[in-house]
Amino acid sequence: MAMGGTGVALSGSHNAALFNPALNVMPDTGEKGTQIKPFLGVRVIDRSNFLGGLYHYQDNNAGARFDRSWLQMERRYSTNRLESGDIRQVTKTAREWRNDLNGLSDRPLHISGSYGLTLSQSDGFTGSGIYIRQYTIGGGTISLSEQNRQRIDQGIKVLNLLAAILDGAKEVDELREIIGFEQLETLIDDAAVTGVASPELQSYYDYPKVEPLVEASIELGRLAVELDEYFELDRLRAALMNGGNQEDFPDLQQYLRYQTDEELDATIYLKGVDITELGMSFASRIEQIEGLTLGTTIKYIELDTIDFSYGASKFSLSQLTDKQFQKTHNMLNADLGISYSLNSNYSLGLVVKNIISREFETILGKTIRFDPIARLGIAHTRDDLTLAAELDLTTNDAKGFDPDKRFLSLGAEYSGWNSAKFRAGIRIDTQNGTYTPSMGIGFGDKSSYLDLGLTIAPKYDEVGGSIQAVWSF
């Protein structure tokens, strides 16, 4: 990890099973002995800033504030003190809650991790090794359905209409009181009987508040017509008029003209693979061609595909390992590797991993492909400095929600003070235009060594770490 993921052209025999089986023998050094290496690595990719949205959701706490504002509206209604501002406070927190939910929805989080153990030995001419590795590659996302999004938006619109109607009704009542509307109604009734408009009635013709009353009444009617698209207004009006005699705000769902789900819930989607590999690798120098080493790894693979969706409110972490969402496959496969030392300073490496292409079906009938992965590398060593460059010749198919990738890796290692090795690198995804820098340090002696690696790319929200120990005999 620390050198950008390089290791195909030049690496210790303890890494051969994972990078290039030909490196079980080091042609330029004739490395001999036995090495044991436990390792652990993890990488998290959050390109859509799901974690940032999650932190904001928790900090903003809009859902709880929505609940509080709704309870406040119910209390005000039950005491005949409900005002439009109470309803608008509900719509304000509802909009914030909706925006926070949208900040979580459909933003995949990709995680990969591995751990295992390798054992290798070399006599300087041939080499072999065994390894066991457990690794998981997958991704997850939370999705708020389009129907639920529409429900939230409709609810906000309805509450805004109710608030506007309250304001409009209040304005109409105030105008009616100003102009003495009850008296005006009486004068109109008298004129209807006598057929003559009295002078008092005629005095209302130019009254400045009559026109605003008419306009406010028309607007109130328009709002009522718009609200009628969502509610059975006659029944709702009767319920609202009895507000002071009820303990609870009317259940608006009872008056809707359309059906809704009982609960608002998001769906969690997870997909990926959980793989156990057990392999044996062999390598040998080719006497007829100086500097050339060939190697192969034969491996048994047990692969569990993970593919499920579940309601977020009912989800628990134990379901990640629930076998009802997994489908197990077994296979034999192999890696082929070549290592060639041009001279004491330059080395070339080529590896093809998983030479047998396979397709695996998930429990939901989807397909996950395992195709061969070819990688070419070159390394240069001089004194205390090592430089490496490697390129994927094939595309790595995505196993979770991440896109397909093809990497160019660059790395450097400097052997410094007291056997410490300082490493740095960068891994560039030529398929998607992203890059991830890395760094690390190794220290120890010929019999034992500890390597630490870190990769972080704030621009693309990617972070990872690795640790491995090596004992030589």
Residue ranges of each PLM-predicted region?
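Loop-centered beta-sheet repeat module
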Residues: 297-360
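Extracellular loop and loop/strand-boundary signature of outer-membrane beta-barrel proteins
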Residues: 102-105, 263-269, 318-325, 361-366, ...
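Outer membrane beta-barrel transmembrane domains
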Residues: 339, 345-473
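Transmembrane beta-barrel domains of outer membrane proteins
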Residues: 22-25, 116-122, 131, 279-285, ...
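Outer-membrane beta-barrel biogenesis signature
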Residues: 1-34, 462
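A subset of solvent-exposed loop/turn segments in beta-rich extracellular surface proteins, enriched
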Residues: 26-319
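Transmembrane beta-barrel outer-membrane domains
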Residues: 106-114, 271-275, 325-333, 367-371, ...
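Flexible, solvent-exposed coil segments and beta strand-coil junctions
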Residues: 1, 89-99, 254-263, 312-320, ...
